[in-house]
Amino acid sequence: MNQEVMNLFNPQAPAQTFDSIRISLASPEKILSWSYGEIKKPETINYRTFKPERDGLFCARIFGPIKDYECLCGKYKRMKYKGVICEKCGVEVTLSRVRRERMGHIELAAPVAHIWFLKSLPSRIGTLLDMTLKDIERVLYFENYIVTEPGLTALKQNQLLSEEEYMMAVDEYGEDSFTAMIGAEAIHHLLASMELEKIAGDLRSELASTTSDLKQKKLLKRLKVVENFLESGNKPEWMVMKIIPVIPPDLRPLVPLDGGRFATSDLNDLYRRVINRNNRLKRLIELKAPGIIIRNEKRMLQEAVDALFDNGRRGRVITGANKRPLKSLSDMLKGKQGRFRQNLLGKRVDYSGRSVIVTGPELKLHQCGLPKKMALELFKPFIYARLDAKGYSSTVKQAKKLVEKEKPEVWDILDEVIREHPVLLNRAPTLHRLGIQAFEPILIEGKAIQLHPLVCTAFNADFDGDQMAVHVPLSLEAQLEARVLMMSTNNILHPASGAPIIVPSQDMVLGLYYLSIMNQNEPGEGMVFADMGELQHALETKVVTLHSKIKGRYKTVDENGNPVSMIYETTPGRMIIGELLPKNHNVPFDICNQELTKKNISKMIDTVYRHCGQKETVIFCDRIMALGFSHACKAGISFGKDDMVIPETKAKLIAETEALAKEYEQQYNDGLITQGEKYNKVVDAWAKCSERVADEMMKRIKAIEFDDSGRQKQMNSIYMMSHSGARGSPAQMRQLAGMRGLMARPDGSIIETPIISNFKEGLTVMEYFNSTHGARKGLADTALKTANSGYLTRRLVDVAQDCIVVTPDCGTDKGLTMQPIVDAGQVVASIGQRVLGRTALDDVVNPATGEVIVQAGRLIDERDVEAIEAAGIQTVRIRSALTCEVRTGVCAVCYGRDLARGTPVNIGEAVGVIAAQSIGEPGTQLTMRTFHMGGTAQVVDQSFLEASFEGTVKIRNRNVVRNSDGHLVVMGRNMAVLILDEAGAERASHKVTYGSRIFVDDGDKVKRGQRIAEWDPYTRPMLTEVEGTVAFEDLVDGISVQETTDESTGITKREVIDWRSTPRGSDLKPAITILDSKGKVAKLARGGDARFLLSVETVLSVDSGAKVRPGDVVARIPTESARTKDITGGLPRVAELFEARRPKDHAIIAEIDGTVRFGRDYKNKRRIIIEPHDSTLEPVEYLIPKGKPFHLQDGDVIEKGDFILDGNPAPHDILAIKGVEALASYLVNEIQEVYRLQGVLINDKHIEVIVRQMLQKVEITAQGDSTYIPGDHVDQVEFDEVNDRLVEEGKKPAEGQPVLLGITKASLQTPSFISAASFQETTRVLTEAAVAGKIDTLQGLKENVIVGRLIPAGTGGAMAQIRRIARSRDDLILDERRKESGVEMANPAIADMAGQPAE
């Protein structure tokens, strides 16, 4: 009621509805139309009376009254004079709120260039005038004149003249024969006199005729700016301002502090500066002061305006009284503290509180304990309303009093209010959506919030002093969403991987594990029990223990729900757990009839969730939590010093290794091995020793021991903790009871003296010092990691935020091919894991029987996966977000299963944000360091190939010869070994590298694990293909080849050295040739000579004059093995991939199929030409630095996509050469590899969604009949639309190819300028948008949050749809009514306006 009365006297304009926001340059007329008056004086307020000065920065006549409905002099007060303008002080009588919206202006005495369009690179003014920024600044800051009208003189248009040159020109040509200007007036004149249409035409014709790349780029840049101005209707001269707007005074307040001082916004200082200089300049012009003084004043005015708009962009930063830089208008928007990120994207909210959390094990999963005091404060409005409704109070004031006194009826009402009203709990940092969940509050005494133990994993919370925030959803809709979508019981699965996240941890795991142990020779072993009653009785009377081996009957149901019972060999403990399992034929007793480690418990919960649904799972989880806690307590498993068993053999192993290290030291001193080799060998030896000590320790700790009566002793408690997955790991146990082993220095290299002691024995001072070295680095790393990981998440969210599920099915026939990922013979990710929850693109057919396992278009679920794996299928084609053809967002079928729900994804799900969170959230678990591989302590490259299935061998592109030793050697560069099953279907295919020895041939049968081929991982062989005699060319001792003797073995080897470093060797071309029986260079079968060009570091394997047969090695090139390279791992690697950076020494990839030819060498590069098999294509040539290990020979056949030079491929190259699918699989596999190393599960589809966002732009290659310019980057959606239109009109469509953008670049290039500006480089984004007159259609999530609307995802998307339907229905009804009454609206324009949202 009160509100309505207020509204009568205080009418608020209804909020305008709008569909889009446009940004453009403001013309002087526009600025004047906004303004309520000119500000002429720099004064702010009178310091005695605190009244604003007239015509000053806070003038009440211009901006409005200070008090509501009261003029400044006090002549008119009260509501009745509303709208009167006081004749004494000139103030309009109205609300003081208008001081937040009324603007003023300052008329400048001289024009001033807007710094954003001048200095924000690329400079718009510079591009338009085709001048360099330096030259423009010279004119602007009064150093040089610029010729604006050359007339008939020899001067050129836009030529710069210094003061002397200008004087000379005036003397020479006379003053009126030409015009030269200086300062912003000159720039304004030039911009105003530009004929944009003509310039655009000229540029286009010039573009068509030019051939140079650089020139083309420059013209393109200029044409783009010109077109922007033409399309947006902005005028270039508006970039130079004659009038500047002044923002409303309440947005730059001046607040009196006590003690007569004032706190003021920096903007007031900046405006004051501008007004002072402007007034001085006006006075100087009136006084007709000398030119030099006026010029100086104009320059100072330009600098003052620059500082107001963007302080520090040019010249010195202007500082305030306390030497602090003043905050200009640009700074208000920029960065984390700017308007966008501080106030628009992150707001503080009412009805929230925070407190410390404690554990609440007796809560149900959907509950949380809320302190009474907190609840009373949070739910105040609800309590007031209820007190009023029940008649305890008649006014809000009374209700307030009652609540303050905490009367008993208030507590009763609080109980009512809180019932079924969920609250949101949030723990910072909120890294993924499970960081905010809804719970039903239970009132508790005390001041700490109680949290259910099972949700701790999702919040990443522990109880060592963590705090959490509580928020109250107020509206009914918000409560509904909280209950249906955010309730903790609805978030059982992890959105990143689909694995359960409500899983017992720590104590609960320990209790369940203890309960499920089976010991030998326990009392009551071999007894049989009919039901739980008997068993309980036996346990209570201690006839059996929890761990006795018994037989028990387990009751469950069959498919039709009829009760059945089965007898299992089990333990009483497992029977107790089995009692809690929901009765379902798909949930057998076997899943808990085993040692329950954390993994097995997780599997158990997953099975229950899949087959029994959510409600059963929640009940089950709560029950096993209680069971776990109670048995962990009863078991009393503790951590004792004597549980850490130090192996007896430790001393012996260490002594052996010390002897070895001494021996290596001796060999080094004798000069047999190098320093590096010694280091590697010593480190290796200690690493092995450490491993063996650890193995011995584990053996001792694991050992099962029996007491005198033959009963099995209690298991080692540390082992139980570690093995169950409750706490601790073998690595930590090794440090406690084995030896600490090798330590790393901060740079990642390994210190060669290990720490021999363990923590139980204690470290010596030296050892302690060594161990602090690497440990401190670890701490520093952790701090950096958090920031880096957060920044990665922010970039990911920004690039993916507008990816939403918009339609049920796009009907595309494109997709990806999924295969299992195999690494060094191990299957890292099975085909089942990769296709689970995806939609099949084609029918998945069992190769043996021909039956269809999954029909095309169906979701592949757990059952299908079992069938697929059983049938041994190796490739499945699936739909993917990457290939989805929806214009904005993705479709539900391409996305597949919503991992957090286990059902097909809903329309409106913000899959982009979920993907970004899933990838970013584990970021803090990844490492930061670059690995330096030392010795074989880490990985040895794979050097052999084993059959992973049994079957028949088939060799594709067979090219093998038998060498002198009788081995089959691979001579082809793209030979593959396939293994076929009985039905002839391909089970596996392996590429075999050139020079490998191969042990099988076409048609051979192989068993699983049989060796197929092997090769030397550290060298690349050069093989001869013809028989003959070896001859050397240009191999001169000491210049191009040198002999080195390996002293430990006494073997000499000859290697090629850098011959170009000596003047004598500069034109040598070292090579090995094979001569035939006539002494001529032998010819190869495919043409060309048998000549091998050698690169630096190649080791010769044959002597001159030796006889060779095909397949023999003539030389070896040592490769950089994995152990000498620095491997970028962890977070930096993920960031590098998402940013699509080119790696340091990236691979060179062949663009076409063809034959390799060597061209003329070029300085220190080798020229390689690929001659295509397809005669319509042009040959492609590559330049490769000499001395890089390089393994192709003249005449080799090469396939598109093969590596010419090894290294990490650049993602852009993969996209250009092999296409989108290959790029996707490369990025997905590389990123997954980093996460897999840390044991983090992330579903492929999340990475695919991000890659989709990186591939949204098309580079125009041919313009056709479109207005595009070749080289333009255009949005895929827009490109398709333009082409569709052109095709309809029968014109030639534009051509383009997809471009890969890194995530930062992609975020900055989103169609929405609001979203881009709030991400990074705010000034640049806004400058660009203003020049182009961009329109933001508010499609993404971020823009809508910023303008304060519901986001177009989830329920917000549904609401928008409902509104659209409602609007169209209203229109229909109105039309009907109009027709019935037969009255047409008089003016059709009015009818249009009625339904039109304002711009």
Curated annotation (Swiss-Prot):
Cofactors: Mg(2+); Zn(2+)
| Enzyme Commission no | 2.7.7.6
Q: Report if keyword Methyltransferase is assigned.
A: no
Q: List ligand-binding residues for Zn(2+) 1.
A: C71, C73, C86, C89
Residues the record lists as binding Mg(2+): D462, D464, D466
What GO molecular function terms would the record report?
DNA binding; DNA-directed RNA polymerase activity; magnesium ion binding; zinc ion binding
Pfam families on file: RNA_pol_Rpb1_1, RNA_pol_Rpb1_2, RNA_pol_Rpb1_3, RNA_pol_Rpb1_4, RNA_pol_Rpb1_5
Q: Name one GO cellular component term.
A: DNA-directed RNA polymerase complex
Which CDD domains would you find in this protein's record?
Answer: RNAP_beta'_C, RNAP_beta'_N
Q: Does the keyword Metal-binding apply?
A: yes
Query: So where does Zn(2+) 2 get bound?
Result: C810, C884, C891, C894
What keywords would UniProt list here?
Answer: DNA-directed RNA polymerase, Magnesium, Metal-binding, Nucleotidyltransferase, Transcription, Transferase, Zinc
Quaternary assembly: The RNAP catalytic core consists of 2 alpha, 1 beta, 1 beta' and 1 omega subunit. When a sigma factor is associated with the core the holoenzyme is formed, which can initiate transcription.
PANTHER family attached here? DNA-DIRECTED RNA POLYMERASE, DNA-DIRECTED RNA POLYMERASE SUBUNIT BETA
Q: What is this protein called?
A: DNA-directed RNA polymerase subunit beta'
**What is the protein's species of origin?**
Chelativorans sp. (strain BNC1)
Per UniProt, what is the name of the gene that codes for the protein in this document? rpoC
